[in-house]
């Protein structure tokens, strides 16, 4: 693997990197130092960029020399990270320079022509688009618009996601486009929409320094959001009264700081949340004035199923599956009666958490003098009742009035750098449009069609195929042309053997993967398109606290690599309107006849109205040079017009290149820290104090939702729970981080974390190879009985970053029926020792 070309004189060891690396058990040789301070190096060109990894939204300073990134360090001007980076962030300068970086389009060929069983062969971009054009048109002729689909990403830049959504929803006229944020943030979206009628957190990171208590629900912030964890740790250690509660199905590094650590049985978080609400009511700590003025009560639909195939027995039994998102009015008294059965005593019995710890947790929320921030990530969201979990934690904050004020915040932390900015805000989900609009709402479609200058009826009125459904439809031959960008869904998607891989190799299907490296998904495709990464293109991300951040293109992409944005827009030139729109639609706007999708979607007088001369002097911009106008500015300003004036306001384009990000809504140049709060949020009417303006009545919803069991639980044949997740050193499927030598060496392969007593009982020793077996498949992996992750008896944890140990061959493709997000935290497995002969 290659590393940045800096000689010894050009590199000094970075103390902060050494500290962070030591915490992760990392060696930090001289070559790994990532902050240059000698005069020669400090004269390099430095510029800001958002970090390429998680949704925290750290800002970094990037040094370039001779068209190459040679160093990075934390941006001391950034409010989010204040000059710090986690260990992944310290090695950002190496993610683009793996030895197997893709630089040419590659098509499967045999005897000089495309063959699904052929070998990957370098081809030109023209030939790549030629075969794509043929396959797209064949699929649409055979099955109509829904014969094609796209799987995108929370790692798309804002304009990449926006351009992709336009191409599919307006151009090809299919809503079969979904981001991999379906696997990480869909439950958070649905939870916000159900409770508040509008998406994204009411608070911000400033709450960390203002609160009295942190409660982590299914969130290992110490490893998954380490920069926020440093801020949380600083608050805890500098203010003796502050308390930290951590809830998880197994112990992890965040427990090291916990004052109240709680390991609960999988799925019983539903019970715990209701029990806390009941405790608040029983002890007379409901903020009655707040509840009366700002909330109404709803009874949610129950027995909603598990998002499995319709013929699955669990789906057949689910009486409420068809109306999973429905709810009905109820009174406060009826809600009180509903939660009364959820006592702390029963919760302790159900969950396995000691009663005294549950009482201490409940008191943090109930005490009116204690400000509380609730953080959660995949433990809540990757859950067959993930939306319910989100609703139930909002219930607690609403009952106590602990919301939308400094130090009081329910906060879903984001996993990807722009799952908020691109997937949620742009609306790249199969049911969404920009600014919280949805395809099922005629007024919303009409507004989108007006902004996009399209005839009425262009955008389909039914949601398209979501992530898991796309895999099923590919397998069943109902989607025949498929484009994957910026994700690795063969490694990341559930039940890979039965539901994902078969669709990729279905002979009727043509699969395109745009990637920078030969991932598992890319190697299963028919055509691989080499993609520009990170600062090889101009970009924008939106982080978890509604902060939008921009960066300039700083270096060129290698070889023939092109950005995802260029690929989308260039491919759109291959389609005349007459080839993709019905005659009756064209008749409503005859001037589009003879034009290409590129002309109608991107050269429409709005996207192309900013000249190349608007690009800040001294910066590259390959896409704008190719198309002849400032693409990013035009796309952003058109997109921003969706949200301005109704609570999603973004600042003018040029403002973001000057700032370390701004938190929307941005009105009159001022960002918003606490939404729904008078004096902070410009959309709150004077004299209301708090206004949940997502709903017309200005009130939030408190939901009555019961405990319901998991889709699959351990039994005699499969006696263990399996949970999957991430580790500090690697990000998602490891496509980038496993190509950084220092990160690879720190955690080279996935292991199966197991309780030592379970291992001893099975005559398994630490380091032994075992099979992790489910009803769907198995992997072989070595056992770890010590270290950072400490499962209770009856549960094992296997991270999913390792492509040689595809744990998602084992997982179940059950989803939350409302959000359609996958539950990667709960399925049943057995552990078999591999006998070495």
Curated annotation (Swiss-Prot):
Disulfide bonding pattern of the chain: none
Key word Aminoacyl-tRNA synthetase present: no
Every 4Fe-4S Mo/W bis-MGD-type domain range: 44-100
UniProt entry keywords in alphabetical sequence: 4Fe-4S, Electron transport, Iron, Iron-sulfur, Metal-binding, Molybdenum, Nitrate assimilation, Oxidoreductase, Periplasm, Signal, Transport
This protein's GO CC annotations: membrane; nitrate reductase complex; periplasmic space
Keyword Signal: yes
UniProt-annotated binding residues for [4Fe-4S] cluster: 51, 54, 58, 86
Domain of life of the organism encoding this protein: Bacteria
Reaction equation(s) it catalyzes: 2 Fe(II)-[cytochrome] + nitrate + 2 H(+) = 2 Fe(III)-[cytochrome] + nitrite + H2O
A GO MF term: nitrate reductase (cytochrome) activity
Pfam families: Molybdop_Fe4S4 (PF04879), Molybdopterin (PF00384), Molydop_binding (PF01568)
Modification(s) after translation: Predicted to be exported by the Tat system. The position of the signal peptide cleavage has not been experimentally proven.
Note accompanying the cofactor annotation: Binds 1 [4Fe-4S] cluster. Binds 1 molybdenum-bis(molybdopterin guanine dinucleotide) (Mo-bis-MGD) cofactor per subunit.
Signal peptide: 1-32
Binding of Mo-bis(molybdopterin guanine dinucleotide), residues: 88, 155, 180, 184, 217-224, 248-252, 267-269, 378, 382, 488, 514-515, 537, 564, 724-733, 808, 825
SMART domains to which the protein is assigned, alphabetical: Molybdop_Fe4S4
Entry's localization field: Periplasm
GO annotation, biological process: cellular respiration; Mo-molybdopterin cofactor biosynthetic process; nitrate assimilation
EC number: 1.9.6.1
Cofactor(s) listed: [4Fe-4S] cluster; Mo-bis(molybdopterin guanine dinucleotide)
Residues that hold substrate according to the record: 800
Family membership: Belongs to the prokaryotic molybdopterin-containing oxidoreductase family. NasA/NapA/NarB subfamily.
Subunit structure: Component of the periplasmic nitrate reductase NapAB complex composed of NapA and NapB.
Function: Catalytic subunit of the periplasmic nitrate reductase complex NapAB. Receives electrons from NapB and catalyzes the reduction of nitrate to nitrite.
Protein name: Periplasmic nitrate reductase
Organism of this sequence: Bradyrhizobium diazoefficiens (strain JCM 10833 / BCRC 13528 / IAM 13628 / NBRC 14792 / USDA 110)
Lineage summary: Bacteria, Pseudomonadati, Pseudomonadota, Alphaproteobacteria, Hyphomicrobiales
Gene: napA
